[in-house]
């Protein structure tokens, strides 16, 4: 009976984990300096990232039945990476960036890095942000725009705390003369 209770308790402890922001302090604490070590870590996004790209297709102007017709069309490409989407490291950059892949495909990864003035050490989405228009980044070898809220997206990881303790119980019956 004790063995069953111990096994169930251990399973509950092992399967539990808390998602926390990934920081440069974790890199030091868990010795994650190499890409090989970093490849063992499952990353998650803290919030939804929506990439937008609008491509205008050249139109044609012509006259038909006495009416001038302007033909033009737009192609909109929207990619959504939901909050808590799992990703893996693709590579690391010279300036401490982490390139995280959320899907297969050439160049389909996003860059995250620690902000120079941030004291929390979190890895935030790295894009060229403008206060008025949001940001721009490259994804899948295409330029996409992101809204300014995406700049607050950071990487998260699951941390499991396992505390192992053993005990030995025995009952002393006493001694008789």
Roles of regions detected by a PLM:
Residues 48-75:
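Mixed-charge, low-complexity intrinsically disordered segments
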């Amino acid at each position: 009976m004790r063995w069953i209770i111990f096994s169930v308790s251990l399973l509950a402890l092992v399967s539990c984990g808390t998602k926390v922001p990934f920081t440069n302090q974790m890199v030091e604490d868990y010795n994650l300096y190499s890409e090989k070590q970093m490849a063992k870590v499952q990353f998650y996004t803290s919030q939804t990232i929506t990439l937008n790209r609008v491509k205008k297709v050249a139109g044609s102007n012509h006259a038909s039945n006495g009416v001038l017709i302007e033909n033009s069309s737009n192609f909109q490409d929207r990619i959504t990476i939901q909050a808590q989407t799992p990703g893996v490291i693709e590579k690391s950059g010279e300036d401490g960036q982490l390139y995280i892949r959320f899907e297969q495909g050439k160049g389909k990864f996003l860059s995250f890095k620690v902000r120079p003035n941030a004291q929390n050490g979190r890895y935030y989405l790295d894009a060229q942000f403008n206060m008025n228009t949001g940001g721009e980044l490259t994804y899948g070898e295409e330029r996409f725009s992101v809204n300014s809220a995406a700049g607050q997206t950071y990487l998260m990881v699951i941390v499991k705390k396992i505390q192992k303790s053993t005990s030995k119980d025995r009952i002393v019956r006493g001694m008789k003369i």
